[in-house]
Amino acid sequence: MGLTVIDYYGKQISKCGYCKGIQCSISHGMHTYQMTPHDYQDLIDRGWRRSGHYCYKQDNKMTCCPCYTIKCDALEFKLTKSHKKILKRMTRFLRDGKKERSEIGGTPTINNEGEGDEGQSGEDGARGGIGDEIHRPNIPVKNINLEAAGKANKNRQKRLTGEEKVARTLYEKSEAKSNDPAKDTDRSQNTCDGVNLPCKKAKQMRLERSLAKQAAKCVSPEAGMTKTRKCPKNPEKSLRDFIDDVTNADRHKLRLNITHVKSKQFEDTLKQSYALYEKYQTLIHNDRPNNVHDYLEFLQRSPLKHCKTEDGPSIGFGSFHQQYWLDDQLIAVAVLDILPYCVSSVYFFYDPDYSFLSLGTYSSLREIELVQQLASSVSSLRYYYMGFYIHSCPKMRYKGKLCPSYLLCPEAFTWHLLTDEIRSKLNAQKYQRFNPEVLAKDIDEFVEADINNVLLLVDQNTCITYNDYIQVSIAFFLLYILSFDMEAFSLFK
């Protein structure tokens, strides 16, 4: 598997990218020349992250915004209503190429969970949530006398109470006489014997029609009478089902290509990916990159060795770019590390022209689906790492909506399900130890004896263990002292 070669920098103090504080972000840092995927897996399971060749770990007790490593169990992942809405939105766009009404004019839609167009924010490569501000349209609000309106409504209810009772009774009788339940729910007139019935909402009418159709299908005539049977429930659609909901007649085609960062395919598409990155950084973060070198340094160059094993995925372990091609146009790129137990999200950028598709959340779902796909052949690979969860930064809390998600205890290094109880504790105090029961002696942590076997790079071609290095250093120090004493002795003589 090779060696991991690092240059440890020690404790670093810098500006915080989350609370924007000056000289308040405290972390440990090191430069990694090369690293095996297994070693990096062990590092991120101890709270480390990488940005290019630089690896860092927040000192959560001292830093302004404690960062907790978060992962999602992809094999137990549950779609929310908001996730389904985003997946269906993509399906409709691919089918007919039209935007929804709320998206016409380039206005981003806000979903039910309060998320808007998710981009990438922060150093840990996690997608951002809603923007700093949501600007509401400047429409003057009418002055309404709520007290007078409330009294008028109560008087109206008193006058109509008797009529409504009669209407409901007649309506129920007519329902009982009908032999075709499907027709009953499709009535276009909400009247009965000249009495107006209360209007139903469109959603309620659709639900009634759906239930009536299901009931009609479950009626089987036997011996001159009808016998009802239970209708089997439709199985809930999986993430893969939503993604596969495409046809050859669709107006647009979306394809995802995954390519290693040192492959010919990456080089062939470098021009398009850099142009997309430049557009994203300029329009979303107002931070235009200086040149392509900055892009490569940040998102292409990786210390992880690309290695393939018999028990690993066919594409191997290492650093990859997952490219989103809409027809022949590159609209998004996800930077990923594929490790022995997980797929780790490094960064994500997209074309702002397609922000109405909520590509940040959509790509998270596609990356979870990638884990599920890899897990079918590699049983140990089942987690999706989303970088850091910063509870004190509201924009980063969206990560906890991918359920089930787990946070890493910063002291015991054990995983804990992100629940409302943990959220309440983090609301009360930013730094928390999630495992109060584990004693120090039980923690699977680096012990002092292990350092004797760590290899130190003396020059480009020579490595020695830390124990040998200490012995050699002591020998050189004694020789230096001895030579100094001999010189002093000769001068004195």
Please describe what each predicted stretch is:
Residues 1-18:
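Intrinsically disordered, low-structural-confidence terminal and linker regions
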Residues 10, 22-25, 34-35, 52, ...:
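Terminal, non-catalytic protein-protein interaction segments that mediate quaternary/complex assembly
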Residues 33, 45-48:
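N-terminal accessory interaction module
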Residues 43, 277, 399:
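A residue-level signal for conserved active-site and pocket-lining positions in enzyme catalytic cores
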Residues 51-64, 73-78, 83-356, 448-493:
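A conserved beta-strand-loop-helix scaffold within acyl/acetyltransferase catalytic domains
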Residues 323-406:
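Aromatic (often tryptophan-rich) hydrophobic motifs at membrane interfaces
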Residues 377-442:
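Active-site/acyl-donor-binding loops of N-acyltransferases
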